[in-house]
């Protein structure tokens, strides 16, 4: 029964509103779960009971059969409607911690293909430990209770691969019906801690995006006095890199949202243009009006429950008007960053499998956010990448936080990048284990010792430990706490010690070092620094470089972004991420797009609370 879909499509078309239709596979109906209860996903907590959305087993053949049927039926019904410009695959797809029969059987088959000889599997994964050795494939144990990080991380990688396959499967069906002018997209999301927090552990965004024409994303974040723009920045940097050279769609972001998110005046505009400044070509809200029942009753939309106009809706109308007016200048913006940050789902899995001390949760994302946010606050604009290859040579600086698990090829490419003139800021635990989470038997940081010029064999937890500067360029008296982990570093001959531990037992060891390697330079940090110290280390590493990514001499809460538009002009965004007015001077000559006035270098500018300006030069 497509009555409501037809009604909405006709209303949108009559109003001149374009439509993206989503495949309806992320929430199974009650009758289907009752008829085929095996389609409900099994996790370590057991088979899920019907109620929430996204509790289906995406590799279950019965679920796939019904999913294909509804996709094809829907597509055949609406494919020619003139309002439709594109198709969204599913919704924030993940594997939902699936450990069910079909997932585990598929995993074992994948290992059989990779390891015709079980002895090699046992060797690579170290399965002799605690008698975990597997001598016959039919003896392969359930994966969910394994004590072996190599096996657990391999299964996690396989689970992510099934998300990639599932989205590609849907895309192939949709493209059988899609018109030539219609695109295929998907709304990726991130690790959730009440808002978008970090790299998504359950999806390989870079692999899954290959099935799409345009990458899409959902970004939610703290608001009111806690609004920083950091989530918009990292979310945009990841999504911008999924389809290189293309812009992306913000398919969901908050309008009013939760009660604690109700935006202060001006914040909705600030958020929307921050998305544009990261490379978004669309900003759309979840959702239009606030719903009156069920789980998301208090996840409010642009309109409140009374459907009447309100300040958030009114502010959104100004955003739409400015988007329409300024599209010639702001459409198809491109980043020209020369700083990149490397992320890895495999390193995340491995690092989180061995939590130090009393650490809990996804510490990889804590580390990622510490490095990203430090540079964001420092007005260093960056791209986020997932590999180092020939394309990486266009970046002058590479940030490598927590690359705990990596094959020798990736680490060698990092060394080669440095040798050819690159600068690298490499974080603790990088290079420690191979791609199978087997710790390297060489001096650490393994292959990276060659470029970093430092080694260690011991490490501990930084209890009552600070660091002190060994060079005039660093003043860490206000940011001297060593956190989470500390490696007892010994510099090679010719390697400079930048920081040293302040502790009665560990004072002889370096905490951060810098070494020349080939034509480049590597800075290695053996602990988790505070944000202010990370920015100082970055400045030391890049002191003699003029970086396009260094967008301003100002610091957070004045956030400055720079993009290139299709006319070849620079677009400078100056965002005041604070509740107080800010007086600055212009760092560029150009035209203020919102007012049309000419702005001169050195001209005083006042930005009210949560206000921004855009200058074309």
Task: Identify what each model region corresponds to.
Residues 22-31, 85-94, 187-192, 252-254, ...:
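Short, solvent-exposed turn/loop segments enriched in Gly/Ser/Thr/Pro and often Arg
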Residues 140, 168, 180, 209-617:
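Carbohydrate-binding surfaces of carbohydrate-active enzymes
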Residues 34-37, 41-232:
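Polysaccharide-binding and catalytic clefts of secreted carbohydrate-active enzymes
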Residues 1-45, 170-178:
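Aromatic-lined substrate-binding rim segments of carbohydrate-active enzymes
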Residues 24, 30-34, 97-103, 196-197, ...:
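Short, solvent-exposed loop/turn and secondary-structure capping segments
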Residues 1-13, 69, 162-169, 230-234, ...:
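Aromatic- and glycine-enriched glycan-recognition loops and surfaces
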Residues 11-14, 78-79, 205-210, 238-244:
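Acidic (Asp/Glu)-rich catalytic clusters
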Residues 18, 183, 423:
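Short glycine-centered segments of the SAM/dcSAM-binding site in methyltransferase folds
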